[in-house]
From Swiss-Prot:
Origin: domain of life: Eukaryota
Biased composition (Polar residues): 278-297, 306-318
This protein's name: Phosphatidylinositol 4-kinase beta
Start and end residues of each PIK helical domain: 52-242
Gene that encodes it: PI4KB
Location of the protein in the cell: Endomembrane system; Mitochondrion outer membrane; Rough endoplasmic reticulum membrane; Golgi apparatus
Region (Activation loop): 687-711
Organism: Plecturocebus moloch (Dusky titi monkey)
């Protein structure tokens, strides 16, 4: 049995400020501050910072037993158990010193002692302020990350590291890129404060382990190769991949050999449990893949696993628990690289379908899509539904993935394979409402095979680069398919007040819906994704479910993901975090701006996965397929100017346009052609592709000099320059900017921390962070901000550079 990493017990927040600190491991920072602490109402940042410094001086005295006084003399604690501990000098002059020096030495010693007592008296009233801040309701994960990054004192850093255990997992997960970037590129004290939490969470969650391994590899890639090989980030990554952080209770768990009972819905368990020779013959998407059972190396590029793995008990051959998932992701990446070598879109599509058909031979397996947000096993990829997306030099592609939801990914058995020709003979099960189905009912609805923790048959356990996935969570719930005539009817259910709708209104709305059903796009060999993306998501789910051998199972779900090779998605991940933070700020400040952050999975420095935006197509595809202006397309899709559907879509357009205009201004988003702006079925616009932000622009052309993209077509949809909705748009811009600058620090710190040690083009230049802060205009009054918004709107609308860039994209890439 190998040495295991001992994690600290999770800390529990104290309910009373006067109680001892959570997770006080004896003689820590908080043992210095034992005074009564009242509820914090107002905190002066300067006072808090000063108090922090004072407290840390006491920490040094406690932990080091010796410190240096303001005069440079070493100090010693006499009673080092509280704030009132006495301090005496250690450099009292010995008796042998010359008599003429005695008086001077005594004076210095006396002055030092008096100075220490004076500082102690002056600071005693302030030393509890830092603790008050840390234990107040104001102290959230954002503030914790800020203190961890900005504090130079090991005591505060260690305390913040312990406090991470007190926050919700999802709150800390949002800042995982920042935590790992600090771990890689900052000093050892920060790394030592962060590591216990990372180790603890890796033991608890296989998905967290995977994401840490991928991000550690991606963010270490900016280091020099000689430094990278021996860096702390590489060592932690090897530790995670070695499976040393596997939950202790599962380390020596032998596979159960008892057969699982069969049910009437599925074939015998032999369907999934194949022999090694069968499994080897049926897989290999790459001809040179080697099975880990005979090759203990996890990756080609890693020289060896951490030395701790050598002591793992080898009484039975146990593959690393992350290896099947990493092999699954590696296979998807390899497909993308092979597609990029083909010349035409049609050839790429045919190759993609055949590659995914081979992939299905290894499913179901103990693999998952990390962006789903719920535990599940991947059972099938409907290969004929995959499409290659538009790209001039690369071959990103979109796939749909069928999964079976489960209660626990690690402990639930992998579902048995159902052959493609074994489509269900009855549809009674899928027609049942799913609202009342429990996890037990879901788990029992399909036959299983034993839970082989070392199941070689589950997936080929080969090595893989740094990889991972992201996708939208989709629950197809029959209880959600309820016709809703208006928002009023929903409100009436919540308020319990009766709302009467005239029969004529119902008939009118029904006729409007029938008259203006969404138009279907024609198939274009040069743009096959347009048809797939235009199809409503619920219709796609229903269609794929009907053709799937697993579709009759009540826990069946459909997910989707875009696979990208040759693109660095670390900037995309940074943009996602900023958008998510702005979305939270606007919700908190009750500003009705609308943006759609989509999930990003960084697999390596040149590959990743993206969550597709469902029910949305690009404005380029809209204009190319319909040959209409944007306003005419709105009228065609949603009805005439006075219909409820059009007015709702127009409002959605305005709220989303204002939100993304602010995002583009604050982040300086470039490459805003119509292929990178989507339009969804409800009228929202969604900006995608944040590869050029802050200090970078495409090919350094400098075409786009306006604050954001606001074309005449956009203004026409809003009702023109004199329309009420255009004024509403400018009002939302002002409200959104005012709200954002109130929380500027939350936005700026996301970017600032990721600049540490980074070689990303968005950070080129020394003034990136300063310019970002200046765009919040903290010194302006609201009247000045209103004038600024008017100027930006007018300048963007009249911008000749926007028109030039759109023309450039049309001539070079055919983007309308």
């Amino acid at each position: 049995m190998g040495d295991t990493v001992v994690e600290p017990a999770p800390l529990k927040p104290t309910s009373e400020p006067t109680s001892g600190p959570p997770g006080n491991n004896g003689g820590s920072l908080l043992s210095v501050i034992t005074e009564g602490v009242g509820e914090l109402s107002v905190i002066d940042p300067e006072v808090a910072q000063k108090a922090c410094q004072d407290v840390l001086e006491k920490v040094k005295l406690l932990h080091g037993g010796m410190a240096v006084s303001s005069k440079g003399a070493p100090l010693e604690l006499v009673n080092g158990d509280g704030v009132d501990s006495e301090i005496r000098c250690l450099d009292d002059p010995p008796a042998q010193i010359r008599e003429e020096e005695d008086e001077m030495g005594a004076t210095v010693a006396s002055g030092t002692a008096k100075g220490a007592r004076r500082r102690r008296q002056n600071n005693s009233a302030k030393q509890s302020w830092l603790l008050r801040l840390f234990e107040s309701k104001l102290f959230d994960i954002s503030m914790a990350i800020s203190y961890l990054y900005n504090s130079k004192e090991p005591g505060v850093q260690a305390y913040i590291g312990n406090r991470l255990f007190c926050f919700r997992n999802e709150d800390v997960d949002f800042y995982l890129p920042q935590l790992l970037n600090m771990y890689i590129h900052m000093d050892e004290d920060v790394g030592d404060a962060i590591k216990p939490y990372i180790v603890y969470r890796c033991r608890q969650s296989i998905n967290f382990s995977l994401q840490c391994a991928l991000l550690l590899g991606a963010y270490s890639s900016d280091m020099h190769i000689s430094t990278q090989r021996h860096s702390r980030g590489t060592k932690l990554r090897k530790l995670i991949l070695s499976d040393e952080l596997k939950p202790a209770h599962r380390k020596r768990e032998l596979p159960s050999l008892s057969p699982a009972p069969d049910t009437g819905l599925s074939p015998s368990k032999r369907t999934h449990q194949r022999s090694k020779s069968d499994a080897t013959a049926s897989i290999s998407l790459s001809s040179n893949l080697k099975r880990t059972a005979s090759n203990p190396k996890v990756e080609n590029e890693d020289e060896e696993l951490s030395s701790s793995t050598e002591s793992i008990d080898n009484s039975f051959s146990s593959p690393v628990r992350l290896a099947p998932e990493r092999e699954f992701i590696k296979s998807l990446m390899a497909i993308g690289k092979r597609l990029a070598t083909l010349p035409t879109k049609e050839q790429k599509t045919q190759r993609l379908i055949s590659e995914l058909s081979l992939l299905n031979h290894k499913l179901p397996a103990r693999v998952w899509l990390p962006t789903a947000g719920f535990d599940h096993h991947v059972v099938r990829v409907p290969h004929t539904q995959a499409v290659v997306l538009n790209s001039k030099d690369k071959a990103p592609y979109l796939i749909y993935v069928e999964v079976l939801e489960c209660e626990n990914f690690d402990t639930t058995s992998v579902p048995a394979r159902i052959p493609e020709n074994r489509i269900r003979s009855t549809r009674s099960v899928e027609n049942l409402p799913e609202c009342g189905i429990t996890h037990e009912q879901r788990a029992g609805s399909f036959s299983t095979v034993p839970n082989y923790d070392n199941d070689d048959e589950a997936w080929s356990v080969d090595d893989i680069g740094e990889l991972q996935v992201e996708l939208p969570e989709v629950h197809t719930n029959s209880c959600d398919n309820i016709s809703q005539f208006s928002v009023d009817s929903i409100t009436s259910q919540e308020s319990k007040e009766p709302v009467f709708i005239a029969a004529g209104d119902i008939r009118r709305r029904l006729s409007e819906q029938l008259a203006h059903t969404p138009t279907a796009f024609k198939r274009d060999p040069e743009d096959p994704s347009a048809v797939a993306l235009k199809e409503p998501w619920q219709e796609k789910v229903r269609r794929i479910r009907e053709g799937s051998p697993y579709g009759h199972l009540p826990n069946w779900r459909l997910l989707s993901v875009i696979v990208k090779c040759g693109d660095d998605l670390r900037q995309e991940l940074l943009a996602f975090q900023v958008l998510k933070q702005l979305q939270s700020i606007w919700e908190q400040e009750r500003v009705p701006l609308w943006i759609k952050p989509y999930k990003i999975l960084v697999i390596s420095a040149d590959s990743g996965m993206i969550e597709p935006v469902v029910n949305a197509v690009s404005i380029h595809q809209v204009k190319k397929q319909s040959q209409l202006s944007l306003l005419d397309y709105f009228l065609q899709e949603h009805g005439s100017y006075t219909t409820e559907a059009f007015l709702s879509a127009q409002r959605n357009f305005v709220q989303s346009c204002a939100g993304y205009c602010l995002v583009c201004y604050l982040l300086q988003v470039k490459d805003r052609h119509n292929g990178n702006i989507l339009l969804d079925a409800e009228g929202h616009i969604i900006h995608i592709d944040f590869g050029f932000i802050l200090s970078s622009s495409p090919r350094n052309l400098g075409f786009e000099t306006s604050a954001f993209k606001l074309t005449t077509e956009f203004v026409d949809v809003m009702g023109g320059l004199d329309g009420d909705m255009f004024n509403y748009y400018k009002m939302l811009m002002l409200q959104g900017l005012i709200a954002a600058r109130k929380h500027m620090d939350k936005v700026v710190q996301i970017v600032e921390i990721m600049q540490q040690g980074s070689q990303l083009p968005c950070f080129h230049g020394s003034s990136t962070i300063r310019n970002l802060k200046e765009r919040f205009h903290m010194s302006m009054t609201e009247e000045q901000l209103q004038l600024l918004v008017e100027q930006m709107v007018d300048g963007s609308m009249r911008s000749i550079t926007t028109k030039l860039y759109d023309g450039f994209q049309y001539l070079t890439n055919g983007i309308m």
